[in-house]
Amino acid sequence: MDTMPNDLLVLLAVSRTAKFTTAAHNLGLTHSTVSRRISALKKSLGGRVLARSDDGWELTDLGERAVAVAEQMETAVAELGNTRQGPDTVTGVVRMTATDGFSAYIASPAVAKLRRRHPGLSVEIVTVTRQALQQRSGLDIEVVVGEPRVHRAEAMKLGDYELGLYASSDYLAARGTPASVDELSDHRLVYFVDSMLQVDDLDAPRRLFPSMKDALTSTNVFVHVEATRAGAGIGFLPCFMADRHPDLVRLFPDTAAERLPYWLVLRPDSMRRPAIAALVQALKDQMLAYRGALEGRGGTNRHN
């Protein structure tokens, strides 16, 4: 096989961006050069390495095997560059997706701690709330809410987090504090846009409090928190985010709550790459350190 190493690295760049134009820009090449390199790789390997999708280019089975080799090459080159200080295998770029809250309060501090030990590591986080993808071209790690149903992927549970009802102290002073769950029908909900919600497990408030109508909805959980603090309505919020704000009061913590799991998804061979294995462990460690807040045991401002 006379496959050129450069062709594999070009495929790696395309797999991470899903687009020839972006890969070309990142590599300092032209679009036509990237196209030629991919065509040459297809000829050398005897099959297609990429397939078109709605979001760009996705790896075929052959392409995934080729990218695994390219990642090993990338790691080896990075190790050679660190020979003066001793090889640090936790280097390169790791790309992950996660929900907004997880990205801010779990992933971000985990990455910060990890990079203090491994400054050659770079992590790209795309915030999104959705089910796990069946094709994850360009992604190393996905963190999703709810147990995923995936093929040709490894899934592991990271831990649970709790959601509860919250209202601002000013809102309760103006509108009155509901004395029971039944009285929630007199108030409106701050939560996700129902028609755009892609995760079934997150549809809890429509099941738990069906009489509540929407006040303000958004695809971003930080909007939920700030809208609730501003008095837009009663929010159904992750406790580890809401309990950070002393102006928010948790309502009916013993009866109006939902506990959901965070799951991590990655390709079966991804843990062979030291950078990915290190980040996965860092995320687990941060989940454990933050467990009390995640499970709703960090707040003191409650109304039963």
Write out the residue ranges for each language-model feature:
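Alpha-helical residues within the helix-turn-helix
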Residues: 25-26, 43, 116
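Conserved amphipathic alpha-helical core elements
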Residues: 41-42, 248
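A short LG(V/I)-centered, amphipathic sequence patch enriched
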Residues: 42-59
